[in-house]
Amino acid sequence: MNVTTPEVAFREYQTNCLASYISADPDITPSNLILQGYSGTGKTYTLKKYFNANPNLHAVWLEPVELVSWKPLLQAIARTVQYKLKTLYPNIPTTDYDPLQVEEPFLLVKTLHNIFVQYESLQEKTCLFLILDGFDSLQDLDAALFNKYIKLNELLPKDSKINIKFIYTMLETSFLQRYSTHCIPTVMFPRYNVDEVSTILVMSRCGELMEDSCLRKRIIEEQITDCTDDQFQNVAANFIHLIVQAFHSYTGNDIFALNDLIDFKWPKYVSRITKENIFEPLALYKSAIKLFLSTDDNLSENGQGESAITTNRDDLENSQTYDLSIISKYLLIASYICSYLEPRYDASIFSRKTRIIQGRAAYGRRKKKEVNPRYLQPSLFAIERLLAIFQAIFPIQGKAESGSLSALREESLMKANIEVFQNLSELHTLKLIATTMNKNIDYLSPKVRWKVNVPWEIIKEISESVHFNISDYFSDIHE
């Protein structure tokens, strides 16, 4: 059966590959198909365009990242397949099977077999495509789990009228390399270059920006009456090109990041439009040049009073502020100390019993280094060292009166409770600290190594916001 190949910008080769692999005939359609490409390369978009262009192909979409682990994914497969078939063939009497009973892969095979048997009255065989969008984002994914999925078709009856076909979209090539011997058909989606990114953004966003209410409102305020839709489109296209040119070195070819900047900057760009410069791209750019000098994102404290950062009204309105909790700030400070201060100094700096030891043994030899450690890559450290230093520097304010019996019962150190690990997870999500593992991170595992991912200037700003003098901890080491 012939299939329709949709037109997708800069993805002609990929759509032709999909047309070769995906069809309504189960005899020529492979049981497993992989689409590999990094975020923002158009895997999901191209696949959706392909199925929209071929309505005779029946597909079920699942996103494993939303299901977290393998057991909910198994249950979601049973539930969605059963519902899809009932929707496609409402006249066939069927028995409902409880998807919550699917707790193991072999139970999924049993459930699918029972579901497919009910459709043996169909005249022709048909394909049901199960699309697992972002399969390698599953939290507890291991090498054995993917093997069970790609072998699932071998456990189902060959003469079944319903043939399930799996399509996986994945980000990392390192995951696929483990299964290279299985010879699974794979379609690669390379990154877009800067010209392709600009073209895609203009094609996808111009219409939306033209219809934005802030542009229409500005046109009415400035009493601009002699402007056509083509000229509105030129204004939007010029703005998108300026965003790409100004921030490409910051975002790379990440379409999602550029889209966020477009949404953030567009209302402010529109506010600079006047009757005199709307037809003059250069004049409009000069009037709004401050928008393209920075992302207007800064890390600062939202506090009031003497410690608040004083800014003028215009700068305050044109900026976003992100505030970390006190625990997150001290964890980040402790991470920097762990990455740039050698472990042999920990006892002399943080121990409360160093005063018992006399002489050089109390503090060790602290020789000024030839190269400032801040100019080097951060060192890796274990979670135990991070928590120990965090406990030593985190201020504990007792609620009881000093010297009272209640004060004796209070803890003198901050405990590594669930709140601490929640803040640690937040810092990892924000990429402020990094690990040697890309996913499935066990925050309590001694095998995981950590490192700080922010420069000295940011750490100094954060430490000043909590009145912590981090420079004292690097005396005679940092220049």
Curated annotation (Swiss-Prot):
* Source species, domain of life: Eukaryota
Q: Pfam families under this entry?
A: AAA_16 (PF13191), ORC5_C (PF14630), ORC5_lid (PF21639)
Q: What is its main location?
A: nucleus
Q: Which InterPro entries match?
A: AAA_16 (IPR041664), ORC5 (IPR020796), ORC5_C (IPR047088), ORC5_lid (IPR048866), P-loop_NTPase (IPR027417)
| Compartments, record wording | Nucleus
Listed GO biological process terms: DNA replication initiation; pre-replicative complex assembly involved in nuclear cell cycle DNA replication; regulation of DNA replication; silent mating-type cassette heterochromatin formation
| Molecular function (Gene Ontology), one example | DNA replication origin binding
GO CC term (a single one): nucleus
Detail which positions bind ATP: G37, Y38, S39, G40, T41, G42, K43, T44
> Which of UniProt's keywords are assigned here?
ATP-binding, DNA replication, Nucleotide-binding, Nucleus
Also noted in the record is: Present with 768 molecules/cell in log phase SD medium.
Family to which the UniProt record says this protein belongs = Belongs to the ORC5 family.
Q: What does this protein do?
A: Component of the origin recognition complex (ORC) that binds origins of replication. It has a role in both chromosomal replication and mating type transcriptional silencing. Binds to the ARS consensus sequence (ACS) of origins of replication. This subunit is a candidate for the mediation of ATP-dependent binding of ORC to origins. May also be a substrate targeting component of a cullin-RING-based E3 ubiquitin-protein ligase complex RTT101(MMS1-ORC5).
Q: Tell me the subunit arrangement.
A: Component of the origin recognition complex (ORC) composed of at least ORC1, ORC2, ORC3, ORC4, ORC5 and ORC6. Interacts with ORC6. Component of a cullin-RING ligase (CRL)-like complex composed of at least the cullin RTT101, a linker protein MMS1, and the potential substrate receptor ORC5. Interacts with RTT101 and MMS1.
Official protein name in the record: Origin recognition complex subunit 5
* Organism the protein comes from: Saccharomyces cerevisiae (strain ATCC 204508 / S288c) (Baker's yeast)
